[in-house]
Amino acid sequence: MEQVSGMTNTRRTLALALAALPVCALAGCSDDPASTTTPTDSTSSSSPSPSSTSSDPPTDSEVAEQAATQLATDYFAAVDHVRQDVKEPLKQLMKVAIGGQLAAQELLTRNQHKVGNRQVGDTRVVDIVIQSVNLDNSDPTAGRVPTVQMDVCWDVSDVDVVNSQGKSIVSPDRADRGWTRFTVANHRWKAQPEDGWRISNGQDLKKAPCSAA
């Protein structure tokens, strides 16, 4: 996203930046780097690995994958809600994001509300591909906590952003679908192995968008 500081007309520049709606503006990506190469051992959330028997309890890795998959949907829903209604408290984002991702999303939403813009419509999650699961929880105080890396294909064809006069500011060149790679971390793994997950950063991927479902 283009920097808006240093411009002579901050209000107009920010409105134009929001109108362009790059992927990270919608996904709320932080600036943390992430690899864009796709590991060969990835699995799609739509095709869960079969267990040996139906009575086998899920492994820790499977629990982490399921939690991350649900979090992707919850994350976009929370982002949509706070951008659609200025009265929605930003603290709701703390339930789905943490660290740089949370800070980036809070800043973007505050700036959007400040200039009178708001979102209309909901983002749709089309596909989720789990890239890796690392359950190392050896040093939580140093940030060494369980993580899941996942690629999410989103669809914003039903999403618009309007200004205070109700006029759309979305660029006609906006891509309606694309991929973002998210890192999901659980800093409360021992106490909350299922619901302690939060998105810590995200990065757009330069690859062909998924097909609309």
Q: Where are the regions a protein language model picked out?
A:
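Extracellularly exposed regions in secreted/surface proteins, prominently low-complexity, repeat-rich
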Residues: 170-213
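Surface-exposed, charged secondary-structure patches
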Residues: 116-167
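Short, low-complexity, disordered segments immediately C-terminal to signal peptides
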Residues: 2, 12-13, 17-22, 29-52
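Short, highly charged C-terminal tails/helix-capping segments
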Residues: 34, 91-99, 201-207
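Sequence contexts marking disulfide-bonded cysteines in secreted/extracellular proteins
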Residues: 30, 154, 209-211
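Core segments of small alpha/beta cavity-forming domains
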Residues: 52-126
